[in-house]
Amino acid sequence: MTKVLIAGFAGAMGQQAVTLVKSLPGFELSAVVGHHLTDLDPTSYGLENSTTVYADREQVETGAADIWLDFTVPAAVFENVSYALRHGMAPVVGTTGLSDEQVEELQQLAKQNGLGGLIAPNFGMSAVLLMKFAKEAAAYFPEVEIIEMHHEDKKDAPSGTALATAKLISENRPAHETAPDSTESLPGARGGDYQGIKLHAVRLPGYVAHEQVLFGGSGEALTIRQDSFDRSSFMSGVKVGLEKVGTLTELVVGLENVL
């Protein structure tokens, strides 16, 4: 049995992940981590007695799990993944907010410890396809902006998916800035900027996770959109990550790179 630890198990994504892991043949939910919990009885959370509950990552010992599945918060994810790698656990990371420099540092740490892992800005298949299609379209439509819409509790902006989309687009189009002479009567009105690609973040109740990539050309426009209406939509990608991570020899970024 492959032992899985879920960090951030009490959150919305964490709860979906708990249900998934418990249903997967060949996988065991060996441990969970919830920040500053006072009740460490697994049955209080609907878990088996065999599942260890930790209130802090520093309490997790080597051998507690084979896989560290992270659905925590941007402020904690770097230290969480570092801890997992130093203690022999292959990370599968759904938490966003890691900088490029932090990802590179984690990749080096994974190499030093002989572990593979997966960092996925989005586990939804529709989002993965959106990124793929947007990259292809950028070769023909260099004028592009991105709008991402999420629930009001999402901490980081822009979303990891929107930023990953911008990075992929920038790989497949010449250096370009849309409307460079535009001015803002309200600071921030034109959104954030990644290599000339404007990114706009919406945070509102009623939304889960949504993204639009808008391309403009002479006399025409192209919009690529994906919508995640329920967090269960991400679990097919999490399942792939859990099943594939044991075959990886490096820390991979992007679910599309293990499909």
From Swiss-Prot:
Summarizing the function annotation, the protein's role is:
Catalyzes the conversion of 4-hydroxy-tetrahydrodipicolinate (HTPA) to tetrahydrodipicolinate.
Active site (UniProt)? H150, K154
EC assignment: 1.17.1.8
Mostly located where?
A: cytoplasm
**Name of one Pfam family that matches:** DapB_N
**Residues annotated to bind NAD(+):** G8, F9, A10, G11, A12, M13, G94, T95, T96, A120, P121, N122, F123
Q: Write out the GO MF terms.
A: 4-hydroxy-tetrahydrodipicolinate reductase; NAD binding; NADP binding; oxidoreductase activity, acting on CH or CH2 groups, NAD or NADP as acceptor
Binding site residues for (S)-2,3,4,5-tetrahydrodipicolinate: H151, G160, T161
Name of this protein: 4-hydroxy-tetrahydrodipicolinate reductase
- What family does the entry list? Belongs to the DapB family.
Catalysed reaction equations from the record: (S)-2,3,4,5-tetrahydrodipicolinate + NAD(+) + H2O = (2S,4S)-4-hydroxy-2,3,4,5-tetrahydrodipicolinate + NADH + H(+); (S)-2,3,4,5-tetrahydrodipicolinate + NADP(+) + H2O = (2S,4S)-4-hydroxy-2,3,4,5-tetrahydrodipicolinate + NADPH + H(+)
The answer to whether keyword 4Fe-4S applies is no
- Specify the species: Limosilactobacillus fermentum (strain NBRC 3956 / LMG 18251) (Lactobacillus fermentum)
Gene symbol of the encoding locus: dapB
